[in-house]
Design a protein with these regions (language model features):
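Generic structural signal for residues in well-ordered beta-strands
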Residues: 2-4, 84
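Conserved Radical SAM active-site core
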Residues: 27-173
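Canonical Radical SAM [4Fe-4S] cluster-binding loop centered on the CxxxCxxC motif
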Residues: 5-38
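Short, intrinsically disordered, charge-balanced linker/junction segments flanking boundaries
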Residues: 1, 172-175
Length: 175
């Protein structure tokens, strides 16, 4: 089955210093978190285009967009979409449960690279610097009740064949 979705970027605030990312905390860019009114307007525009699946995307900054913010967003847009997916900062089981109860169906997390030795070179500071916490995110999401969990690697950071292989191993473990 092929499913079409539309991303809705909620915030570009991020506490991470990923060397490859435009949301890097050190980048001097205008930062924004959508208000509930802006979320409502954007979600309506997406739904009016015929999309029934939405992906909520944000930089990793619980201070600016945390679990309570995401809960409010999900509850606000739930009547407009058959499926609500999230691609935000990794969370605890308890926080993920809040989002499942609010109506989120799917969580996606990219490990970026499965090479634990090179991982710190790409993620020197911030929440994402914790390799193990990120690696175990799909386990926590599933434990919290997400019906769908997606994983991936950002091919090109390290040897793409190795990352593809370890993504497949990770998937096999999760199944």
């Amino acid at each position: 089955t092929i499913r079409m979705y539309e991303p809705l970027y909620l915030s570009n605030y991020c506490h991470n210093h990923c060397v490859y990312c435009g949301f890097n905390q050190e980048n001097k860019i205008v930062r924004k978190v959508l208000t509930m009114e802006e979320v409502q307007a954007e979600a309506k525009a997406i739904a009016d285009m015929g999309f029934t699946h939405i992906l909520l995307v944000a930089g990793e900054s619980p201070k600016h967009a945390g679990v309570e913010y995401y809960r409010q967003v999900i509850e606000l847009i739930r009547p407009m979409f058959a499926q609500i997916s999230i691609e935000v900062q990794p969370m605890s089981v308890e926080d993920y449960k809040v989002l499942v109860e609010a109506g989120a169906h799917y969580v996606c997390v990219y490990q970026e690279t499965y090479n634990e030795e090179s991982y710190p070179r790409f993620h020197p500071k911030g929440l994402k610097a914790n390799y193990r916490f990120r690696l175990e995110t799909p386990d926590r999401a599933a434990e919290a009740g997400f019906r769908k969990v997606g994983i991936g690697a950002l091919l090109g950071l390290d040897n793409w064949r190795t990352d593809a292989f370890f993504t497949a191993l990770h998937l096999d473990y999760l199944e």
